[in-house]
């Protein structure tokens, strides 16, 4: 138990470097311009007409810990639904602070413990990004994913994938043209709303990071939301064929097939992001080859300093040094006057 206390630019070049962390793959272009978003993406990701709800956020309570505090909010995330949000705030900060959204399955996971009870959650050891970032001086926010919020009558445990399936089926019945990944993206952008409105946050310095499911959410929301200035993702499947995009709670097999037939790839979203810094930490569901196959076509990857793939090739969960490289990438672009240097 824890004690509570647009497609222009020259051909992209790829540079591979061996490091102690694994293979670093960087992509760059001499010039860049934000693309328009292809219609297939708009159809799948745009919030459907009629999906309207009153925006509100309720502060529930605050927990205090040695290095940071955690504010607990309930935030409206759809017609008749709310998501729980944890915002971790570092101790000793002054002025307006940089902030990072940390999407994942549920908030406690990104802390590594339940702040209400002190119960440790060892399953998430090594990816407790919310706590890690607060200790680095960021305001960090995370929330429930929609499998926990869309069905208000759900009784399945939060880690039961039957709950994902039922939530996705309900979403598809209610909003036939939408996708699960569209809902995930919309809910993640609500975290950006909350951070941008927080008086403790410098709204010009907001980033996003995520692992696995959280990596998917971070990539989509980070590419689509201009308020996000830097994106870090970990092992989420940048190539259509390397992870479970066919599952109903993401795209569903028919929608993935249609996107592939139309020639759509995740390069479209990164091009639309217009050159904002992007880092992919690869390990199992991503690797250097799959990332290069997608990202070689992205003119908005300006240079090897701003568009980087680190392939640690050691499995799905990032080792500490790889995750530290991701944190330093955030530091580099959100704390320009700090002494942190990007891991090479």
Predicted regions and their residues:
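Boundary at the C-terminal end of the N-terminal hydrophobic targeting segment
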Residues: 28, 32-34
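C-terminal catalytic histidine-bearing segment of alpha/beta-hydrolase fold enzymes
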Residues: 302-344
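The feature captures the conserved acid-bearing segment of alpha/beta-hydrolase catalytic domains
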Residues: 240-298
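Cap/lid segment of the alpha/beta-hydrolase catalytic domain
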Residues: 103-189, 242-245
């Amino acid at each position: 138990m824890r004690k509570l206390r647009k497609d222009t630019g020259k051909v992209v070049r790829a540079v591979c470097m061996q490091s102690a962390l694994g293979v670093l793959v960087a992509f760059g272009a001499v010039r860049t311009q934000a693309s328009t978003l292809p219609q297939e993406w708009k159809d799948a990701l745009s919030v459907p007409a009629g999906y309207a709800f009153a925006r509100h956020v309720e502060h529930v309570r605050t927990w205090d810990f040695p290095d940071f505090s955690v504010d607990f909010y309930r935030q409206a995330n759809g017609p008749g639904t709310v998501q729980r949000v944890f915002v971790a705030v570092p101790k000793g900060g002054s002025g307006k602070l940089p902030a990072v959204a940390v999407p994942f399955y549920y908030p406690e996971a990104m802390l590594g413990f339940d702040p209400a009870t002190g119960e440790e959650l060892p399953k998430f050891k090594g990816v407790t990004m919310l706590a890690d970032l607060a200790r680095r001086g960021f305001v960090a926010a995370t929330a429930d994913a929609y499998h926990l919020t869309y069905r208000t009558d759900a009784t399945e445990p939060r880690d039961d994938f039957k709950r994902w399936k039922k939530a996705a089926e309900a979403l598809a019945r209610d909003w036939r043209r939408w996708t699960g990944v569209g809902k995930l993206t919309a809910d993640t952008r609500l975290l950006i709303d909350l951070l941008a409105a927080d008086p403790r946050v410098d709204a010009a310095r907001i980033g996003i990071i995520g692992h696995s499911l959280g990596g998917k959410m971070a990539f989509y929301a980070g590419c689509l939301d201009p308020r996000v200035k830097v994106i870090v993702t970990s092992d989420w499947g940048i190539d259509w064929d390397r992870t479970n995009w066919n599952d109903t709670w993401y795209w569903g097999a028919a929608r993935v097939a249609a996107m592939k037939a139309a020639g759509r790839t995740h390069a479209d979203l990164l091009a639309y992001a217009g050159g904002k810094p992007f880092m992919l930490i690869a390990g199992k569901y991503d690797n250097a080859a799959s990332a290069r196959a997608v990202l070689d076509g992205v003119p908005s990857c300006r240079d090897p300093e701003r568009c980087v793939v680190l392939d640690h090739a050691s499995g799905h969960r990032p080792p500490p040094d790889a995750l530290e490289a991701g944190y330093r990438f955030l530091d580099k672009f959100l704390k320009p006057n700090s002494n942190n240097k990007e891991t090479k």
